Amino acid sequence: MERSLIILKPDAVQRGLIGPILTRIEQRGLRIVGMKLMQIDESLARRHYAIHEGKAFFDSLITYITSGPVVVLVVTGKNIIEIVRSMVGATNPVKAAPGTIRGDFALDIGRNLIHASDSPENGEMEVSLFFRPEELVEMHRSTDQWIYE
């Protein structure tokens, strides 16, 4: 099973979108195995977004992600990376399809509400940045038999 890190960014928290976004995640049948409200400090932000270091938007990205509380969660499941990214929508909300989180709730690329891991390898790396193993729960729901083959 793959794992994906999802971050509901400061704009999602400030706009009161935690509930609607979590509802979509749960209604889709995704299994949440870790979740916390936290403030990302600059050191963690720089490690998480290290791939973007040196790009023109890097400093503003760090300022943005550290500007307020975020909700960080880990979801797990078969093909979870692809599923979550299709739910999230294009990075630029202008290009995000209606029905996606960004397509329905975001308007600007600089305030695009949500982060999701882009590969199984990055998912594992990102999960380890934000969660200790003991913070994650092994969860099996009675509905799993109706979701996964």
Swiss-Prot record:
Lineage: Bacteria, Bacillati, Chloroflexota, Chloroflexia, Chloroflexales
UniProt cross-references to SUPFAM superfamilies, sorted A to Z: Nucleoside diphosphate kinase, NDK
Localization per Swiss-Prot or TrEMBL: Cytoplasm
TM annotation in the entry: none
Keyword annotations from UniProtKB, A to Z: ATP-binding, Cytoplasm, Kinase, Magnesium, Metal-binding, Nucleotide metabolism, Nucleotide-binding, Phosphoprotein, Transferase
GO biological process: CTP biosynthetic process; GTP biosynthetic process; UTP biosynthetic process
Matches recorded under InterPro entries: NDK-like_dom, NDK-like_dom_sf, Nucleoside_diP_kinase, Nucleoside_diP_kinase_AS
Subunit structure: Homotetramer.
Any GO molecular function: metal ion binding
SMART domains: NDK (SM00562)
Gene: ndk
One cellular component (GO) term of this entry: cytoplasm
Catalyzed chemical reaction(s): a 2'-deoxyribonucleoside 5'-diphosphate + ATP = a 2'-deoxyribonucleoside 5'-triphosphate + ADP; a ribonucleoside 5'-diphosphate + ATP = a ribonucleoside 5'-triphosphate + ADP
Protein name: Nucleoside diphosphate kinase
Pfam families found in the cross-reference section: NDK (PF00334)
Active site: 115 (pros-phosphohistidine intermediate)
Function, in words: Major role in the synthesis of nucleoside triphosphates other than ATP. The ATP gamma phosphate is transferred to the NDP beta phosphate via a ping-pong mechanism, using a phosphorylated active-site intermediate.
Organism: Roseiflexus sp. (strain RS-1)
Family recorded in the similarity comment: Belongs to the NDK family.
Cofactor(s) it depends on: Mg(2+)
CDD domains xrefs: NDPk_I (cd04413)
Positions with a binding annotation for ATP: 9, 57, 85, 91, 102, 112
Protein EC: 2.7.4.6
